[in-house]
Amino acid sequence: MTDSLQHLVRNDNLRLAYRVVHGTHPTVVWLGGFHSDMTGTKAQVLADQARATGGGYLRFDYFGHGQSDGAFEDGTISRWREDALAAIDELTEGPLVLVGSSMGGWLACLAAIARPERVEALVLIAPAPDFTEKLMEPELSDEARAAIARDGRWIRPSEYDDGGYPITRALLEDGARWSILAGPVPIEVPVRVLQGGADPDVPWTHALELANSLTSTDVVFTLIKDGDHRLSRPQDLERLAAAVAEARMLAEPVDDDPVARRLARAARARAAGQAPATAWAAADMGPEEE
């Protein structure tokens, strides 16, 4: 198993940085948040979980994020969706569990819709579908709107980045192309949603709207009343690890022998429980993802 930094060259010769843990199917794919990267605590916890349990795991940085090529302000939902699909198509095989955080929850849904034959389960953390239209635009001040109209961009202050980050006209206009909350959202696989009740960035009602829009009948919405947007406390990481372990069991290939299938699931659950999430948490949380 390896987790060394590698690069996937896209059609425009720009590179996507990624790390992979080779292991058993289904493969877990991490989709990070807006202006985040694959070194965040939750992404690292899942890498440690994969190594501990022998499961396959892929994490990557979108265009303009982390160690990938490109300028962040040139990014759009269309581009990042294409990145996610390229990573899935070129770097994985077999059944998948997509784990999406914040914007990554939106992209996970878009990827599941585009690749229904591959995606077998979703775990969504503070999912922010349609955030450009539903969460970002309504909060723009008159000054910000004027700057975007005049200059095509505005620097948004952020508690996650001292320098803030650009919000562009292209991002807002392109985001509208990929709206899904009008529903129904054609995803039929099991979905587990983890949402903080004290999240200042994605209201729990927004995440619940997504859960209610999914066509899947196997949707579990977990509200962590005192949880924030990051959900990176030890107890939050334990919930995440448990949700991913459950999703992997639900997504594993069907065996003709039901006894063998039950034994395999039990063994995988035991293996997941032998490495508590509190031990997987990185000592230095570093720049946290949304």
Model region roles, listed by residue range:
Residues 25-33:
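Short beta-strand element of the alpha/beta-hydrolase
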Residues 105-116, 122:
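Short glycine-enriched nucleophile-adjacent loop
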Residues 74-90:
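Alpha/beta-hydrolase active-site loop
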Residues 34-47, 205:
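The serine-hydrolase catalytic nucleophile loop
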Residues 1-23, 233:
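N-terminal cap/lid segment of alpha/beta-hydrolase-fold proteins
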Residues 91-102:
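Alpha/beta-hydrolase fold nucleophile elbow
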Residues 118-224, 228-270, 289-290:
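The alpha/beta-hydrolase serine catalytic core
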